[in-house]
Amino acid sequence: MKLHDLRPAEGAHRKRKRIGRGHGSGKGKTGGKGMMGQKARSGPGPYRTFEGGQNRLVKRMPFKRGFVNKFRVEYEVVNVGSLVDWPVDLEVTPETLLARRLVRRKRMPVKILGDGELTQPLVIKAHKFSASARQKIEAAGGKAIDLTWVVERHSRSRGPNPSMRNARQS
């Protein structure tokens, strides 16, 4: 095979459509746009959810509105009532809760809620406590210790790395 034998694939080079060059061309007058109307006009056309003036589906379904907060933190929830049989000498931590299968996911922060009764004094370490849970824990003679939960948030800036800012000023 030589260089002059090479040919593009069949149908790879398509001729440009010449619109509005008389009805003999097949694309004269309306240029393939059909008769008059909103879709025949130039420009971007109606918005995606437009239904011709009828109340659109997005508006008819109120639960589909709003936005999703990407910074929202979801918690693994444990009620105080589920800690009734907990041994007094064992601290309640996210790791021990995971080992006893009271929480499912390791990578989520733990919140203690105040549903149920607590009788024994427990030392509970969690990332968040409801007011009623904290009150019940302290009323039973235990301690509610807050743990910090660090969320790694990436910068939305596409500019230079902020940590390199001082390095470039030489």
Curated annotation (Swiss-Prot):
Any GO BP annotation: translation
Classification via Pfam families: Ribosomal_L27A
Keyword Ribosomal protein included in the entry's annotation: yes
Biased composition annotated in UniProt, kind: Basic residues: 13-26
MF-aspect GO terms: rRNA binding; structural constituent of ribosome
Keywords: Ribonucleoprotein, Ribosomal protein, RNA-binding, rRNA-binding
Residue ranges with Basic and acidic residues bias: 1-12
Gene3D superfamilies, per database record: 3.100.10.10
InterPro entries named in the record: Ribosomal_uL15, Ribosomal_uL15/eL18, Ribosomal_uL15/eL18_sf, Ribosomal_uL15_bac-type, Ribosomal_uL15_CS
Function field: Binds to the 23S rRNA.
Family of this protein: Belongs to the universal ribosomal protein uL15 family.
Alphabetized PANTHER family for the sequence: 50S RIBOSOMAL PROTEIN L15, LARGE RIBOSOMAL SUBUNIT PROTEIN UL15M
Subunit architecture: Part of the 50S ribosomal subunit.
Stated name of the protein: Large ribosomal subunit protein uL15
Source organism of the structure: Chloroflexus aurantiacus (strain ATCC 29366 / DSM 635 / J-10-fl)
Native organism taxonomy: Bacteria, Bacillati, Chloroflexota, Chloroflexia, Chloroflexales
